[in-house]
């Protein structure tokens, strides 16, 4: 008999005892989406002819980069010993920027599959997500993936996994998402080992939102896990954090295509459609209840997504400003963590200050704007939010160097993160050197096995948002992995460095940096601009300044015409007169002349070397 269930349990009439909710947690590239594909095939939910790789990753960028950005939930039938079970698989993002989404997806489950690449072993984000799963008291099934690879070392990593979560290396399942080996055994183990969901079917309805997606035709599709009670179509529901109420137009399950049902009961995972057009109306982590019979208390763990990294986005062509505004509005419909406000720059024109969860979020948003809306954008160097206290006790929050107050400053506080770095032990020295150079304070070090080490540091967020990850990868030959989470604020000695051209400040090049690094930034920026700005008829000084104190200077030499070319021989006083006249002209020119900074110079000065390499590859 095929283990595929002959009669799949019907939504809204499913006994919680036969429901199993689980998610797959893994580091990027450990084969999470491929394993999900094999499960969809094994359970017969997706026919072989419709199958495509990374079936659940719907966005082009997700498929190209091989990463999962939005969570997905799929209901699959599976039969064990003659009983048909309903398995709800919630696919989660693996990247550190999307940790909050992962934590909500974990809260919607009773169990988690801890997936580890048999050729690479445990990585930093696997650990971070494992700790999240343990905090949520999930039952964990350890699994080694990619055992078909020639470089796989299943015995070594099975022992590492077993020592990490306690248990026997023999209990670690070995599967291959590519060939499908061991997938059926894994599905059987999910049914046997994971607990059934618990909840009160007669209590007022409570369902937790773990994701919401904007659909052009149907509005916001909200994915929920029902904890108590029942939800039915055509009921009026209420969001408990915003108190907004909506009518349920459609309710159903994804299998994996949306299938409407008569409702959702305790323990079930499905989707709701209310016709709302903005994902901010259904926030991830919020509780949905019945308006007529509301629940007294919302489910725990809800938090507003808070942007950590800010960057200015400007269209290369000023006429594209309205297009950029519309594009950001549309992206906001699908991305509750994105915030933006208009800003102007004397150098770059009109644009927006946009807040992101992290650098990957910034990169993906920018790529989507350029690709889906055909925009050419300049993005300014990413920076973080500082809290500046003035001497009159007034507090200013600064996300843009041009907003930095000029008065008497009592103290500046900057956001901190606690970072966990995993790497082979031969790179410990290089990692410590890197973290020390970024003002890091060591928090501890643990050996996971004889050749893998976990290093914990507390670092300023501003030091890791720019190029920390790239340098870490190159110093550890690609073996290092990083995970971080916000960890309060601390007082720091920060200054604003202004770049001036001929005494005029250029706001786009200003930066807030630590006093020790201000000189290095000034020298780097003035040197870069000297090469990029074309020579003028007069000498142009490029200066870096903190307040009124100049800390670095470069000069662009003047182009001069050879005024003596027409003098053949002749009197020295004649030549001197011509030279003096030229000198006077240059002096007058310098008084009234302005320096135009070409667009190319802006782009080149604001992009890091890494993004230049990317542009060359294009």
UniProtKB/Swiss-Prot annotation:
The keyword Phosphoprotein does not apply. SMART domains: EFG_C. One of its GO terms (cellular component) is plasma membrane. It catalyses: GTP + H2O = GDP + phosphate + H(+). It is an enzyme of class 3 (hydrolase). Keywords: Cell membrane, GTP-binding, Hydrolase, Membrane, Nucleotide-binding, Protein biosynthesis. One of its GO terms (molecular function) is ribosome binding. Pfam families: EFG_C, GTP_EFTU, GTP_EFTU_D2, LepA_C. It is a peripheral membrane protein. PROSITE patterns: G_TR_1 (PS00301), G_TR_2 (PS51722). One of its GO terms (biological process) is positive regulation of translation. It comes from the Bacteria. Required for accurate and efficient protein synthesis under certain stress conditions. May act as a fidelity factor of the translation reaction, by catalyzing a one-codon backward translocation of tRNAs on improperly translocated ribosomes. Back-translocation proceeds from a post-translocation (POST) complex to a pre-translocation (PRE) complex, thus giving elongation factor G a second chance to translocate the tRNAs correctly. Binds to ribosomes in a GTP-dependent manner. Its EC number is 3.6.5.n1. Belongs to the TRAFAC class translation factor GTPase superfamily. Classic translation factor GTPase family. LepA subfamily. Residues 17-198 form the tr-type G domain. This is Elongation factor 4. GTP binds at residues 29-34, 145-148. InterPro entries: EF-4 (IPR006297), EFG_III/V (IPR035647), EFG_V-like (IPR000640), EFTu-like_2 (IPR004161), G_TR_CS (IPR031157), LepA_C_sf (IPR038363), LepA_CTD (IPR013842), LepA_IV (IPR035654). It is found in: Cell membrane. The gene is lepA.
